């Protein structure tokens, strides 16, 4: 049997909002498997759907850079927030985002690019920065968005300097409409994406494995129902799920009475042309990276007194 620690129970409670005893029971039933325990609780109706963002603990910066009809976003990690506020680190992150505009959009392509004002590659520049500052750093990921007509809007949450912060969003609006209207709308939608963290533009973009997982949970929660009833339950449940996690179906954070789809239709009238979201990118600092926590302070003091 797995060792069910208090920390594991706490993490499951934070993910699901379920009670302590329910979480302990779920972990015992699933032999300490955290994700399986989340599903177990949901099947029992004891937890809401959990977003798989993972524990966020890495430090560093997300940087965005726009230039006309294309934009780039990068994430550079450091071990401490102190280093993330270092001028040299910030300059590196900003230049990396600018360079990404003219690369192929891959991490390898950016790492191999020549850093401005030197003969070094981006990766070599980072290695020298590590040696200078004395802390490990990583150029973790990069992405680009392009649009032939329209605008690419950006938003940085937790901004500590222009284009640098904890969450970065790019959203491409494709339209022949008024650029000022599109720019304002784009920024509002970028802020919406930062707040709601959609996993896809619409239902067709959701990972089939995730859809199957949600379907199985709905079936197990409603076990014993006739087949024709079960089919309707699963269909209805998936519709609710899509409204929660797909951008076009989400209620607009600036006006909850409208979905993003409805907002785009209304914007077409103001812009003088149809408006469509071609794509979006959302980077949250440290997303999916798990950092080992230090020992419990009370336990550490107790051990020292033995």
From Swiss-Prot:
A GO term, aspect molecular function: translation elongation factor activity
Matches recorded under SUPFAM superfamilies: Elongation factor Ts (EF-Ts), dimerisation domain, UBA-like
Region (Involved in Mg(2+) ion dislocation from EF-Tu): 80-83
CDD domains hit by this protein: UBA_EF-Ts (cd14275)
Pfam families per record: EF_TS
Keyword tags: Cytoplasm, Elongation factor, Protein biosynthesis
Subcellular location: Cytoplasm
Recorded GO CC terms: cytoplasm
Presence of keyword Protein biosynthesis: yes
Family: Belongs to the EF-Ts family.
Protein function: Associates with the EF-Tu.GDP complex and induces the exchange of GDP to GTP. It remains bound to the aminoacyl-tRNA.EF-Tu.GTP complex up to the GTP hydrolysis stage on the ribosome.
Name of protein: Elongation factor Ts
Native organism: Methylorubrum populi (strain ATCC BAA-705 / NCIMB 13946 / BJ001)
Lineage per the UniProt record: Bacteria, Pseudomonadati, Pseudomonadota, Alphaproteobacteria, Hyphomicrobiales
């Amino acid at each position: 049997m797995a060792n069910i620690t208090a920390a594991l129970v706490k993490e499951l409670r934070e993910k699901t909002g379920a009670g302590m005893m329910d979480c302990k029971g779920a972990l015992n039933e699933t032999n300490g498997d955290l994700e399986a325990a989340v599903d177990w609780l949901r099947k029992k109706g004891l937890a809401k759907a959990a977003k798989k963002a993972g524990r966020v603990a890495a430090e560093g910066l997300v940087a965005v850079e726009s230039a006309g009809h294309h934009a780039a976003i990068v994430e550079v990690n450091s071990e401490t927030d102190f280093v993330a506020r270092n001028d040299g680190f910030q300059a590196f992150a900003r230049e990396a985002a600018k360079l990404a505009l003219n690369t192929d959009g891959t991490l390898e392509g950016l790492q191999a690019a020549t850093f401005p004002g030197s003969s070094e590659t981006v990766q070599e520049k980072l290695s020298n920065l590590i040696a200078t500052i004395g802390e490990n750093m990583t150029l973790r990921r990069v992405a680009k968005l392009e649009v032939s007509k329209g605008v690419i809007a950006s938003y940085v949450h937790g901004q500590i300097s222009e284009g640098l912060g904890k969450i970065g969003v790019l959203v491409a609006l494709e339209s022949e409409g008024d650029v000022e209207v599109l720019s304002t709308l784009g920024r509002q939608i970028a802020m919406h994406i930062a707040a709601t963290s959609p996993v896809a533009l619409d239902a067709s973009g959701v990972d089939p494995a995730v859809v199957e997982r949600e379907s199985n949970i709905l079936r197990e929660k409603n076990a014993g129902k006739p087949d024709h009833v079960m089919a309707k339950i699963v269909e209805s449940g998936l519709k609710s799920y899509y409204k929660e996690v797909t951008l076009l179906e989400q209620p607009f954070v600036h006006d909850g009475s409208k979905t993003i789809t409805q907002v785009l239709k209304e914007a077409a009238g103001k812009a003088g042309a149809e408006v469509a979201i071609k794509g979006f990118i959302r980077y949250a600092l440290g997303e999916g990276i798990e950092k080992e926590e230090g020992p419990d302070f009370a336990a550490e003091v107790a051990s020292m007194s033995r």
